[in-house]
Structures are given as C-alpha cells and as structure tokens.
Amino acid sequence: MAVCAGRLKCFGNPAVSLRTAASRAYATTTSPDPAIPSSSSASSSSALPKRPQTSFRDKLNAGPSFSDFLSGGNRDDARILDPNEAYALKTALVGPKGKKKEITRLPSWLKTSIPDSNNYKRIKNDLRGLGLHTVCEEARCPNISECWGGSSKSAATATIMLMGDTCTRACRFCSVKTSKTPPPLDPHEPENTAEALSRWGLGYVVLTTVDRDDLIDGGARHFAETVIRIKQKAPNILVECLTGDYAGDLEMVALMAKSGLDVYAHNVETVEALTPHVRDRRANFQTSLRVLKAAKAAVPSLITKTSMMLGLGETEEQMWDALRQLRAANVDVVTFGQYMRPTKRHMPVHEYVRPDVFELWKDRALEMGFLYCASGPLVRSSYKAGEAFIENVLKKRRAESTGPESTNVPNVTPDAIVR
C-alpha cells in the first residue's frame, strides 16, 4: 500500500509530471543504440504482428522521375517516330486460358466519341416519330455523333435511308438487313421525309435507299417523288442522292437525275478485281460506271460522285485503274475511307490503311482532275457532305452555270410519276 501511495503521490506532483513528459519526448526523438538490446522494444515487436512486405515502395522508388515527363533531351524515347513506328498496329491475346488467340487492336485513328449531343437526340427522336430510317444507324457509321451533332443545324448532315430497312442484296461488307421479300413501300414516306427535313432546317441532306430488286423500277419513282416533295417544302436545301444501279436500267437513272437533286452519287465500293468478292453477285463495276455516265448525260451540269473503301486487299495498280475509269466516266467527286468490319459474319479487314496513305491518294485524285476528294480512315460516302460540297464543289459549279439548269428546278412533278 505504501508503494502504491508513493507512486500516486509522484504522478500527482506537477513538477514530476513535466520531467516525466520531457524525458518521454526526448526518448521518442533519439535513436536507440542498435548494439544495446532493448527489452521493451523486443517485447513490443513480439507482441505486434508484422505487416507483409509489399513491392509498392520499391515501385515508387524505381518509378519514373520528373525528367521522364519532360519532352526533349537525349533519351531514346524522346526522338520523333517515323510513320512506320507511329502507325504500327498493336496486338492483344484474348480468350480463355489455353485457347487464347491474337487479335489486332483497333488503331487509335479509328476511335470516335460516343454520340450525346442535343442535336443528335433531337434528330433521332424525330426519325423514330416519323418512322424513318437512316443509313447512319443501320450501317453503324462511326461518324454519327459528328454528322448529326454539327456545330449548328445548317452544319449537321443526315443520311436518310428510304424504302425501308431491308435490302434485297447481301454485300459482304454491309450490315443492313437482307431479304428476298422485304415489306412493301410506305406511300406516305415521301411526304413524311419532306416534312421532317423542312422542320430540321438542315443545309444539306443525303438520301439513300436499300436495293429493291423486287420492284419493277427498283424504287426509282418512289425515290424521285421524295426529292420533288423535299424541294417543294425546302427549296434551299441541297439534296444528294446515293442510288443503286437499278439493275442497269438507265431510264430509271435518268428519271432520278432529272428529279431536282443536286448531287448524284453511286458507289463503286471497291476496285474492279475485288467487286465479285465484296459486293452482291448482281452488282458489277462496269454497270456502276454506266450508271454514273447516264446520270451525267441526262443532266450535264449535275455533280456525280462515287466512293471506294480501302483495306480490302486492293493493290496500287488496281486503284490507279479504277480512278482512270472513273475519270473517263466524268465523275466529279471521289471519296476514300477505311473498311471496318461490322460483325464477325462479314468479310474481315485485310489491312488498316495508314492516314498518310489516304492523304497520298487524295493528292493523286486531285492531280487526275477530280473536282474534290475526301480521303481519310473515317471518311464515308456522305461524311461531312454538306461542308465539303458547299465550300469546294457546289458553289463553284453554280457560279459557273447559267440558265435554267442552274436553278435545279425539278423537271417532273409528283403527279407525272406513274407508279
């Protein structure tokens, strides 16, 4: 009891408490001599469980320094890469263990943003409300956010697909649904399409269709009536029509060319040698050339346009041959884009063509006499069509044209079209 009382008296003394606290503080700031074992430290170390060693601290110590984040210097990775290294494709192993296979990653220059703009949502809602389809959605175009978004209404470009969403042909590159007996045409579609476009206030629109080999005229009269309705409701809008080949019926081609459209487009899709392997068996490179020639013959002031995909296995000589034939057919505009496989059911990509190669073919096309060439990995037939034509082709052609043809008044009326 005496001992306990003495200890209580010491702790109750302020002077003793201060000296004790000071000695404890000093003890924590001084390092004990490692040669002298401490019974208290030994007991505490045995009482506390040891943490497992991790390599996190080692990774930090061996990690990048501040100089690694600075450009320049004499480091090997600071040098400028040549195009072969910069555009080198990366691969990855995917699949379960033991069954992994190597795939080629999508190049960085082919990646796009997810569409989320207000203009995109508005156009999509209007399309659904009127029961209209677009090739942008059906063909899974990677540029939909850019084209539908647009910096303004007049800058936005929509590509409306007429005559339903089911095609009678089955090209190996296309993701549009196919059937031998697609649904019948909607008689209200021309009026609904014209109403939607006049409401949106777009400066440029691209109209395209599925192939309808089940119809006698291939749907040309339905297509022409739609153009006429649009020009009646929105005469200032520029209309580009991407048509099929109408099974080689050049009378239907002339009917479309005289409907009041501004640009007549028909895609050859690829070089002549690869056409049987890429397009439907009913499609033919020479037939496509005849379609483009017939459109120009029907309306000489009309702008004609075609598009080709790269990365299908075409050779340089085959490309030269295709361009020479297109120029001989007086085609005004050509576009080049990278083929991208929609699903595993479609033909695989033979090659991801580098952006500098697209630039090379653009320069070559312009040197051959094409009025305009859009060329790039993400370029599609209607990619930024309004911007390109307004600035580079259409205004120039209209300025040079004089007479009634320059006004582009339709030569036929809806009542004159015999169904």
Swiss-Prot record:
| Comp. bias intervals (Low complexity) | 28-47
Residues bound to [4Fe-4S] cluster 1: C136, C141, C147, S382
- Provide the cofactor note recorded for this chain's UniProt entry: Binds 2 [4Fe-4S] clusters per subunit. One cluster is coordinated with 3 cysteines and an exchangeable S-adenosyl-L-methionine.
- Gene Ontology CC, one term: mitochondrion
Sequence positions that bind [4Fe-4S] cluster 2: C167, C171, C174
Q: Which reaction does it catalyse?
A: [[Fe-S] cluster scaffold protein carrying a second [4Fe-4S](2+) cluster] + N(6)-octanoyl-L-lysyl-[protein] + 2 oxidized [2Fe-2S]-[ferredoxin] + 2 S-adenosyl-L-methionine + 4 H(+) = [[Fe-S] cluster scaffold protein] + N(6)-[(R)-dihydrolipoyl]-L-lysyl-[protein] + 4 Fe(3+) + 2 hydrogen sulfide + 2 5'-deoxyadenosine + 2 L-methionine + 2 reduced [2Fe-2S]-[ferredoxin]
- First and last residues of the transit peptide: 1-26
CDD domains given for it? Radical_SAM
Q: What is its EC number?
A: 2.8.1.8
Family annotation (HAMAP family): Lipoyl_synth (MF_00206)
Stated family: Belongs to the radical SAM superfamily. Lipoyl synthase family.
Spell out the protein name for this chain: Lipoyl synthase, mitochondrial
Please report the organism this UniProt entry assigns to the protein. Coccidioides posadasii (strain C735) (Valley fever fungus)
